[in-house]
From Swiss-Prot:
Pathway: Amino-acid biosynthesis; L-histidine biosynthesis; L-histidine from 5-phospho-alpha-D-ribose 1-diphosphate: step 1/9. This is ATP phosphoribosyltransferase. One of its GO terms (biological process) is L-histidine biosynthetic process. Keywords: Amino-acid biosynthesis, ATP-binding, Cytoplasm, Glycosyltransferase, Histidine biosynthesis, Magnesium, Metal-binding, Nucleotide-binding, Transferase. Its EC number is 2.4.2.17. NCBIfam families: hisG, HisG_C-term. One of its GO terms (molecular function) is magnesium ion binding. Its cofactor is Mg(2+). PANTHER family: ATP PHOSPHORIBOSYLTRANSFERASE, ATP PHOSPHORIBOSYLTRANSFERASE ATP-PRTASE. Catalyzes the condensation of ATP and 5-phosphoribose 1-diphosphate to form N'-(5'-phosphoribosyl)-ATP (PR-ATP). Has a crucial role in the pathway because the rate of histidine biosynthesis seems to be controlled primarily by regulation of HisG enzymatic activity. Feedback inhibited by histidine. It catalyses: 1-(5-phospho-beta-D-ribosyl)-ATP + diphosphate = 5-phospho-alpha-D-ribose 1-diphosphate + ATP. One of its GO terms (cellular component) is cytoplasm.
């Protein structure tokens, strides 16, 4: 295989690592990590993977060290890297929802609006984005870099407020902090280096990866339902069915019965199945989906 037919992909190390490896597994790529090794195996001879800090992946793509990778929209904005955003992949450490960078203060502080922090010190890992947020709002503050344990900075009296990322807000509340504003909504993005995107083979491979990752993410919120329905109840059952497309209806060997199959939102199932049963469906089977393209 020529070197041109090898795609170098950056897998985020840290909080997104497990969720990303699981997503690739559902998409058809098994990533096998080795202890203290930043070059995991992947079951595709056309891919070579590297574990990288999510903050560094945009620069590695810009410099051509990697061809494609996954990072956060937040770090793409922070670095200002000149790369191609292929797609949004809305998943995170614990959910398939975007995360938020929020402005938080001590629960008993007098600050209720960002404007109240004029002249104060803000601690954050997201320096550039935070500075631009306050500059755009015309609020003079001192923004300091936090090397970690950012929530503790206010508690320890090292900062008046923090800008920190959260999915649920639980950790921030646990530290006795109160959110007063949202600075940035962020999610995982698939990005490509410009040279890789301009290469026809690499672009096709990147688009293949994107298609299957998107399909696996979409499947997370969906389930399939199969059921048998007597002919005299068919219309009543079909009236209950939402679907991505029209449900599949096929006559069984016994011409008085039909097999019906649909794909529905997972959140609807607990209410839908009893209604289908009441409408006359029998032998209802629910099954999970791996990908929905």
């Amino acid at each position: 295989m020529s070197g041109n037919n090898m795609l170098k992909i950056g897998i985020p190390k840290g909080s997104l690592e497990e969720a990303t490896v699981n997503l690739f597994a559902r998409s058809g790529w098994k990533i096998r990590k080795h202890h203290r090794n930043y070059f995991p195996e992947i079951n595709d001879p056309e891919l070579t993977a590297r574990l990288c800090r999510v903050q560094e992946i945009p620069r590695y793509l810009e410099d051509g060290v990697l061809d494609v990778g996954l990072t956060g929209k937040d770090w793409l904005l922070e670095t200002g890297a000149d790369v191609v955003t292929v797609s949004d992949l809305v998943y995170s450490k614990v959910s398939n929802r975007p995360a938020r960078w929020v402005l938080a203060v001590a629960g008993d502080s007098p600050y209720v609006r960002p404007e109240d922090l004029a002249g104060c010190t803000i601690a954050t890992e997201l320096l550039g984005v935070t500075r631009r947020y306050f500059e755009d709002a015309g609020i003079p503050v001192k923004v300091q870099y936090s090397w970690g344990a950012t929530e503790a900075k206010v508690v320890e009296g090292l900062a008046d407020a923090i800008v920190e990322v959260t999915e649920t807000g639980t950790t921030i509340k646990a530290h006795g902090l109160r959110i007063i504003a949202e600075v940035l909504l962020t999610n995982t993005v698939l990005i490509a280096g410009k040279a890789a995107w301009a290469d026809p083979w690499k672009r096709a491979k990147i688009e293949q990866i994107d298609l299957l990752l998107q399909g696996a993410l979409r499947a997370d919120s969906l389930v399939g339902l199969k059921m048998n329905v007597p002919a005299h109840n068919l219309d009543a059952v079909l009236d209950q069915l939402p679907s991505l497309n029209s449900p599949t209806v096929a006559g069984l060997r016994d011409s008085t019965w039909y097999a019906v199959e649909i794909v529905v939102e997972n959140d609807l199932v607990r209410d839908l199945i009893p209604r289908l049963r009441a409408a006359g469906a029998e032998g209802i089977i629910e099954y999970s989906l791996n990908k929905v393209i």
